[in-house]
Amino acid sequence: MNETNKTLVGPSELPTASAVAPGPGTGARAWPVLVGFVLGAVVLSLLIALAAKCHLCRRYHASYRHRPLPETGRGGRPQVAEDEDDDGFIEDNYIQPGTGELGTEGSRDHFSL
């Protein structure tokens, strides 16, 4: 190598960290993207809340309401006579009424370990 190609660089000529500008692919654009994403999410949630508050989708929601069909004169169910003892409770046939007493002392003695 010849002497003309060798150049010495002094410490004052080296680039410092403050002099180097960040490139377009670094974290310089991270804050605007993050702020834009957060603002977009907030605006979208506010629009959804406003639509729910003002009942903008009421006609679409009305099809999900379930109501009994209106009674017509023909083709309806025949009227069934209700029993006299119908008190609104469902009877449990597992335990028959009148069989066994609750306070029997001998029932504990039948089981042994």
Swiss-Prot record:
What residue ranges lie in the Cytoplasmic compartment?
51-113
Keyword Transmembrane helix tagged: yes
**Which region ranges are annotated with the description Disordered?**
1-22, 66-113
The annotated topology with respect to the bilayer is:
Single-pass type III membrane protein
Where are stretches of biased composition, namely Acidic residues? 81-90
What are the annotated GO cellular component locations?
Answer: early endosome; plasma membrane; recycling endosome
Q: Does the UniProt entry include the keyword Glycoprotein?
A: yes
| Broad class of where this protein is predominantly found | membrane
State which residues carry a glycan (glycosylated).
N5
Q: List all topological domains (Extracellular).
A: 1-29
- Coiled-coil stretches are none
Q: What does this protein do?
A: May be involved in membrane trafficking between endosomes and plasma membrane.
Among PANTHER family, the record links this protein to: LEUCINE-RICH REPEAT-CONTAINING PROTEIN 19 LRRC19 FAMILY MEMBER, TYPE III ENDOSOME MEMBRANE PROTEIN TEMP
What name does UniProt use for this protein?
Type III endosome membrane protein TEMP
Species source reads Homo sapiens
* Gene from which the chain derives: C1orf210
